[in-house]
A protein has these predicted regions:
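A short beta-strand-loop structural module common to alpha/beta enzyme folds
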Residues: 1-9
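Anionic-ligand binding patches
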Residues: 12-174
Length: 174
Protein backbone atom coordinates (compact mmCIF):
# COMPACT_ATOMS: atom_id res chain seq x y z
CA UNK A 1 0.00 0.00 0.00
CA UNK A 2 1.24 3.49 -0.91
CA UNK A 3 -0.13 6.64 0.70
CA UNK A 4 -1.06 9.13 -2.01
CA UNK A 5 -0.52 12.35 -0.09
CA UNK A 6 -3.68 13.85 -1.62
CA UNK A 7 -5.24 16.69 0.41
CA UNK A 8 -8.73 15.32 1.05
CA UNK A 9 -10.00 18.74 2.15
CA UNK A 10 -9.12 20.31 -1.21
CA UNK A 11 -12.08 18.85 -3.10
CA UNK A 12 -15.35 20.60 -3.84
CA UNK A 13 -18.04 18.21 -5.04
CA UNK A 14 -21.79 18.45 -5.57
CA UNK A 15 -22.59 15.29 -3.62
CA UNK A 16 -21.07 12.41 -1.67
CA UNK A 17 -20.86 10.16 -4.73
CA UNK A 18 -18.91 12.77 -6.71
CA UNK A 19 -16.70 13.50 -3.71
CA UNK A 20 -15.52 9.90 -3.18
CA UNK A 21 -15.01 9.35 -6.90
CA UNK A 22 -12.97 12.54 -7.30
CA UNK A 23 -10.81 11.65 -4.30
CA UNK A 24 -10.28 8.08 -5.55
CA UNK A 25 -9.17 9.38 -8.97
CA UNK A 26 -6.78 11.91 -7.44
CA UNK A 27 -5.29 9.29 -5.10
CA UNK A 28 -4.83 6.74 -7.89
CA UNK A 29 -3.32 9.31 -10.23
CA UNK A 30 -0.87 10.55 -7.56
CA UNK A 31 0.39 7.02 -6.96
CA UNK A 32 0.34 5.93 -10.62
CA UNK A 33 2.49 8.91 -11.59
CA UNK A 34 5.32 7.43 -9.50
CA UNK A 35 4.61 3.67 -9.68
CA UNK A 36 5.67 2.49 -13.12
CA UNK A 37 4.10 -0.60 -14.74
CA UNK A 38 1.66 -1.57 -11.99
CA UNK A 39 -2.11 -1.69 -11.67
CA UNK A 40 -2.93 1.07 -9.19
CA UNK A 41 -6.15 1.26 -7.17
CA UNK A 42 -7.23 4.48 -5.48
CA UNK A 43 -10.11 4.40 -3.00
CA UNK A 44 -12.03 6.77 -0.79
CA UNK A 45 -15.07 6.26 1.44
CA UNK A 46 -17.63 8.50 3.10
CA UNK A 47 -20.65 7.65 5.21
CA UNK A 48 -23.71 9.74 4.38
CA UNK A 49 -26.07 10.14 7.32
CA UNK A 50 -29.05 12.51 7.32
CA UNK A 51 -27.80 13.87 3.99
CA UNK A 52 -24.38 14.84 5.37
CA UNK A 53 -21.13 13.11 4.30
CA UNK A 54 -18.99 11.91 7.19
CA UNK A 55 -15.33 11.09 6.64
CA UNK A 56 -13.04 10.31 9.54
CA UNK A 57 -14.08 12.15 12.70
CA UNK A 58 -11.88 15.04 13.81
CA UNK A 59 -12.25 14.26 17.51
CA UNK A 60 -13.48 11.57 19.86
CA UNK A 61 -16.36 13.85 20.82
CA UNK A 62 -17.40 14.19 17.18
CA UNK A 63 -17.25 10.39 16.80
CA UNK A 64 -19.43 10.04 19.91
CA UNK A 65 -21.98 12.51 18.51
CA UNK A 66 -22.15 10.66 15.19
CA UNK A 67 -22.43 7.20 16.72
CA UNK A 68 -25.07 8.36 19.20
CA UNK A 69 -27.16 9.84 16.38
CA UNK A 70 -26.82 6.60 14.36
CA UNK A 71 -28.33 4.40 17.09
CA UNK A 72 -31.14 2.34 15.60
CA UNK A 73 -30.92 4.15 12.27
CA UNK A 74 -29.37 3.69 8.84
CA UNK A 75 -27.15 5.58 6.44
CA UNK A 76 -25.27 4.96 3.21
CA UNK A 77 -21.58 4.17 2.86
CA UNK A 78 -20.15 5.36 -0.48
CA UNK A 79 -16.81 4.12 -1.71
CA UNK A 80 -15.14 5.46 -4.83
CA UNK A 81 -12.55 3.47 -6.75
CA UNK A 82 -10.20 4.31 -9.58
CA UNK A 83 -7.99 1.74 -11.29
CA UNK A 84 -5.11 2.68 -13.57
CA UNK A 85 -3.02 0.31 -15.68
CA UNK A 86 0.53 1.64 -15.44
CA UNK A 87 1.47 -0.09 -18.70
CA UNK A 88 -1.33 1.11 -21.00
CA UNK A 89 -2.33 4.21 -19.04
CA UNK A 90 -5.97 3.16 -19.21
CA UNK A 91 -8.15 4.32 -16.33
CA UNK A 92 -11.64 3.53 -15.04
CA UNK A 93 -13.51 4.81 -12.02
CA UNK A 94 -16.82 4.31 -10.28
CA UNK A 95 -18.72 4.34 -7.00
CA UNK A 96 -20.49 1.65 -5.00
CA UNK A 97 -22.84 2.26 -2.10
CA UNK A 98 -24.29 0.10 0.65
CA UNK A 99 -26.89 0.90 3.31
CA UNK A 100 -25.71 0.24 6.86
CA UNK A 101 -28.24 -0.36 9.68
CA UNK A 102 -27.06 0.24 13.24
CA UNK A 103 -28.22 -1.39 16.42
CA UNK A 104 -28.99 0.56 19.56
CA UNK A 105 -25.72 0.74 21.48
CA UNK A 106 -25.41 1.57 25.15
CA UNK A 107 -23.33 4.45 26.44
CA UNK A 108 -20.95 1.92 28.01
CA UNK A 109 -20.49 0.16 24.65
CA UNK A 110 -19.77 3.47 22.92
CA UNK A 111 -17.31 4.48 25.65
CA UNK A 112 -15.45 1.18 25.33
CA UNK A 113 -15.39 1.40 21.53
CA UNK A 114 -14.21 5.00 21.47
CA UNK A 115 -11.45 4.15 23.95
CA UNK A 116 -9.93 1.78 21.35
CA UNK A 117 -9.23 4.68 18.95
CA UNK A 118 -10.60 2.70 16.00
CA UNK A 119 -13.35 5.24 15.33
CA UNK A 120 -10.80 7.92 14.52
CA UNK A 121 -9.33 6.02 11.57
CA UNK A 122 -12.46 5.18 9.57
CA UNK A 123 -15.18 6.98 7.63
CA UNK A 124 -18.29 7.48 9.74
CA UNK A 125 -16.40 6.33 12.87
CA UNK A 126 -17.25 2.65 12.30
CA UNK A 127 -16.11 -0.35 10.33
CA UNK A 128 -17.65 -3.69 9.44
CA UNK A 129 -14.39 -5.59 9.96
CA UNK A 130 -13.36 -4.24 13.34
CA UNK A 131 -14.54 -3.68 16.88
CA UNK A 132 -17.66 -1.78 15.83
CA UNK A 133 -18.96 -4.71 13.76
CA UNK A 134 -21.25 -6.04 16.55
CA UNK A 135 -23.02 -2.66 16.62
CA UNK A 136 -24.11 -3.04 12.98
CA UNK A 137 -27.44 -4.85 12.62
CA UNK A 138 -27.08 -5.40 8.89
CA UNK A 139 -26.21 -4.10 5.46
CA UNK A 140 -28.19 -3.83 2.25
CA UNK A 141 -25.74 -4.27 -0.59
CA UNK A 142 -22.20 -5.50 -0.87
CA UNK A 143 -20.45 -5.85 2.52
CA UNK A 144 -17.01 -5.35 0.91
CA UNK A 145 -18.10 -1.82 -0.01
CA UNK A 146 -18.38 -1.01 3.70
CA UNK A 147 -14.90 -2.40 4.31
CA UNK A 148 -13.54 -0.02 1.67
CA UNK A 149 -12.89 -2.09 -1.45
CA UNK A 150 -16.01 -3.13 -3.31
CA UNK A 151 -14.89 -6.37 -4.92
CA UNK A 152 -17.68 -6.42 -7.55
CA UNK A 153 -16.91 -2.82 -8.56
CA UNK A 154 -13.16 -3.52 -8.55
CA UNK A 155 -13.64 -6.46 -10.94
CA UNK A 156 -15.89 -4.35 -13.21
CA UNK A 157 -13.41 -1.48 -13.35
CA UNK A 158 -10.52 -3.84 -14.11
CA UNK A 159 -12.53 -5.29 -17.01
CA UNK A 160 -13.03 -1.76 -18.39
CA UNK A 161 -9.25 -1.35 -18.67
CA UNK A 162 -8.83 -4.87 -20.09
CA UNK A 163 -7.28 -6.40 -16.97
CA UNK A 164 -8.80 -9.63 -15.65
CA UNK A 165 -9.04 -9.86 -11.88
CA UNK A 166 -7.45 -13.30 -12.22
CA UNK A 167 -4.35 -11.65 -13.75
CA UNK A 168 -3.71 -10.13 -10.33
CA UNK A 169 -3.65 -13.44 -8.51
CA UNK A 170 -0.21 -14.25 -7.16
CA UNK A 171 0.93 -17.83 -6.53
CA UNK A 172 -1.22 -20.90 -6.15
CA UNK A 173 -3.31 -20.75 -2.99
CA UNK A 174 -5.05 -24.09 -3.51
Amino acid sequence: MVVSGVDEDDVDAADTESLVCTLAVRKARAVADRSGPAVVVGCDSMFEFDGIPHGKPSSTEQARQWLTAMRGRAGTLYTGHCVIDGVSGRQADGVACTTVRFGVTTDAELDAYLATGEAMAVAGAFTLDGRSAPFIDGVEGDPSTVIGLSLPLFRTLLARIDVAVTDLWVGDDR
